Amino acid sequence: MISDITDKIIPEIQEWQKRKLESVYPIVFIDATHFHVRDNGQIVKKAAYVVLGIDKDGMKKVSTITIGKNESAKYWMTVLNEFKNHGVQDILVLCADGLTGLKDAISAIYPKAEYQRCIVHQIRNSLKYVPYTDRKELANDLKTVYKASTEELRYTNLLELEEKWKHKYPGAIQSWIDNWDVLSVFFKFSAEIRKIMYTTNAIESLNSTYKRINRNRNVFPTDMSLLKVLYLSTLKAEKKWSRMVDKWDLCLSQFRIMYEGRI
């Protein structure tokens, strides 16, 4: 049976989960993909949280995959503590969607790390419930915020955006106002670093691989059966990541100036 064959990789997965990680990661991404898993006789929706790091050599690697039901500060403290126990002493910038409790957990475990909420997800969430007739115009107005050349211009454009759209789509606009502190970290960096943080191609392509798994299988019998498939898919995806991030030497020199003594 296929399950008997894949069971042979369980020790390999366990070793992978215990391996030593880099001491410092300039950029870390956390993202989630949801799957249906059987748990105590019931089918429940669980998230596979993927932590992907870009190391000092500019190489992308999946650091950990954890499967859980509930996001909370306590949950994320467990995940980040595990990260620290595997040797990660410092993270310069951590990019993620608005995962519940993550911001507080980062402050507790990696207090020097800067938390950047994912711009791509923020844009998607803002446009999700906007009718097609307004979507293009609002998307263009959002660009004036996240592509503005100066901090002053960005905030001015944000206020203009709020004034124009707040009555028609209050939820979409209020999210930018409420989360500006974790959306605006992005803007302190050069165009080269912002491109890495903005596009998140590595984790997006990885998630598209995971979503294909979802289409091919409706329900996983156990957490381990899900983890086995994710692990094998991750190994396959990582084989394509043979090159360093574009313009990494330039990015690294900027990180060393901005975070002197930490990298």
Regions found by a protein language model. Name each.
Residues 38, 104, 128, 208-211:
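Active-site-proximal flexible loops/turns
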Residues 19, 35, 42, 52, ...:
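Flexible, active-site-adjacent loop/turn segments at secondary-structure boundaries
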Residues 1-5, 93-100, 105-141:
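Conserved beta-strand -> loop -> alpha-helix junction used to position metal-binding or nucleic-acid-contacting
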Residues 8-96, 100, 104, 109-112, ...:
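RNase H-like nuclease fold core
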Residues 2-3, 45, 73-77, 96-103, ...:
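Amphipathic alpha-helical transducer elements in NTP-driven molecular machines
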Residues 1-40, 93-95, 116-125, 152, ...:
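Conserved, well-ordered core segments of regulatory domains
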Residues 3-14, 74-81, 85, 100, ...:
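A broad, structural surface signal
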Residues 111, 144-263:
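Acidic/histidine-rich catalytic cores and adjacent linkers
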